[in-house]
Each structure stands twice: as structure tokens, then as C-alpha cells.
Amino acid sequence: MSINNTNTSIAKGIIITNLTGYITIADVDKWFYSFERTCHSFIKQGKKYKLFVNRKGYTPEHFSVQKLWKDRFFSTEILSHTIAVAFLLDAGDILDHLSQTNTKENIKFSHDYEQLMDWICQFK
């Protein structure tokens, strides 16, 4: 089992959230509490934000873990305040599919941390 990272922080005005390693339902709950609190710090000030979502090295304990993450992350309130979202994922079929089918200019998927961080920092 790999060590998990459920940390959320702010750097360069970007909310960076991590959900990596071997993840359980309890880990998603812990992650969401920190993630939501960080997003609300911007929302309360009437500010929009950029999100950098690190899911590289993510291994859910059970399919219900992925469903819970999806239900929590894709909250209308949280996403309606975003300027752009960058998803760092493992290379492979899922990343390829998401990259090829994405039609939104303010969303990007990649396995390359530096490329993705450059993109979100420069996104206007």
C-alpha cells in the first residue's frame, strides 16, 4: 500500500488539492473537509479561484470511494467559483480519454506536473 496524501493548500493563488495513494471512504471525508474549507475561504471573499487537482497515484479501496469523491468534488457551489481546473493523473487510457473528449478551455488533464502547473498559472 502506498502512503496517501489528502492535503489541500494554496500556492500562487491556486488551490492545490491532493488525493493520492491508497484511499478509503474516511480519507475522502478527511480530504473534503480541508478542500471545502479552503474553497470557502475564497468564496466568502467573493473571489474565484483556480484548482490544481493531484490524483496521480490514486488507488481507491473500493469503487464507492471514487463515487464519493466525484459526488463531493463536483459540487455546483465549489465549481461555479472556479476559473480553471487542472487535473494531474496517471498516464494511461483514462487520461487519454479525458484529454481527447474534453471540450472546455478552462479544464486540462495531464500526467506532467510542470506542464500542468505552467498552464494553470498562465490561464486567464
What are the residue ranges of the model-derived segments?
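Amphipathic, Lys/Arg-enriched alpha-helical "gate/interface" segment within cytosolic domains
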Residues: M1-K124
